[in-house]
Regions:
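SDR active-site strand-loop-helix element
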Residues: 5, 29, 54-58, 96-101, ...
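NAD(P)-cofactor binding segment of oxidoreductase domains
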Residues: 54, 68-97
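N-terminal Rossmann NAD(P)H-binding glycine-rich loop of SDR-like oxidoreductase domains
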Residues: 1-21
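NAD(P)-dependent short-chain dehydrogenase/reductase
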Residues: 136-188
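Conserved catalytic-core motifs of eukaryotic protein kinase domains, centered on the activation segment
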Residues: 64-72, 107-112, 158-159
C-alpha cells in the first residue's frame, strides 16, 4: 500500500493521477485527513494504512511568509511533521520518498551550473533552513530513503510560475518579471 501526504497539492495531485493510471493501491491524505504535526495521529494513520511506500509531499511552501508571520508554521510542518513521518516510516518498516527543495542551497551558481546531491547545503531562507533540518531528521531516523530536491515545480494542477504567467498573459498586455533568478524547472508529472 502506498501512502501520500500532501495529496491535494500540486505534486500530490499529479501523483494520484499517475497511480490511478497504473492501477496502484494508495491512500491519499491531506491536512484535513492527516495533521503531520501530530505524532499520535501520524502513527494511527500508519497503523491503519500499513504502507510499504510513503510519498511525503506535504510541506509549508509559502517561502516569503516563512521569513516572518509563517515561521512557526513553516517549522511545525516542514521539520516536526517530517520528523513524525520519518519516525512512523521507520516504526512501520516502510520506504520514504521525501520531496525537498533547491532552497537548501545558496543560489550562488551561475546559469548553466548545477548542484549535485553531495554538495554542501547553505540555505539563505527560513524555508530552505527547515528543509535542510527535515533532511537531517530523515537521515538520523532512517537507513534507507529517497530524497528528491525539486526546483520551480510546475504542472497542470496547482499554482506555479507557468500558470501565473499564463493567467497574466490573459489579463495584461505587458508582463514584467524578475530577470535575476535562474533555476531548473521540475515538471510535476
Amino acid at each position: 500500500m502506498i501512502l501520500i501526504t500532501g495529496a491535494n497539492g500540486q505534486l500530490g495531485t499529479e501523483l494520484r493521477y499517475l497511480l490511478d493510471e497504473r492501477d496502484e493501491d494508495y491512500v491519499a491524505t491531506d491536512v484535513s485527513q492527516l495533521d503531520i504535526t501530530d505524532a499520535d495521529q501520524v502513527d494511527k494513520v500508519f497503523s491503519e494504512v500499513k504502507p510499504t511506500l510513503v510519498f511525503h509531499c506535504a510541506a509549508y511552501t509559502a517561502v516569503d511568509k516563512a521569513e516572518d508571520e509563517g515561521k512557526a508554521l513553516d517549522y511545525a510542518i516542514n521539520v516536526t511533521g517530517t520528523e513524525n513521518i520519518a519516525k512512523a516510516t521507520a516504526t512501520h518498516g516502510a520506504t520514504l520518498v521525501y520531496i525537498s527543495s533547491d532552497y537548501v542551497f545558496d543560489g550562488e551558481k551561475t546559469v548553466g551550473e548545477t548542484w549535485s546531491e553531495d554538495e554542501q547545503t547553505n540555505p539563505q531562507t527560513e524555508y530552505g533552513r527547515t528543509k535542510v533540518i527535515a533532511e537531517q531528521k530523515i537521515q538520523e531516523t532512517l537507513k534507507h530513503f529517497y530524497l528528491i530536491r525539486t526546483s520551480w515545480l510546475f504542472g497542470k494542477y496547482g499554482k506555479n510560475f507557468v500558470s501565473t504567467m499564463l493567467d497574466l498573459a490573459d489579463k495584461k498586455e505587458k508582463i514584467e518579471v524578475v530577470n535575476d533568478q535562474h533555476g531548473c524547472p521540475t515538471w510535476s508529472r
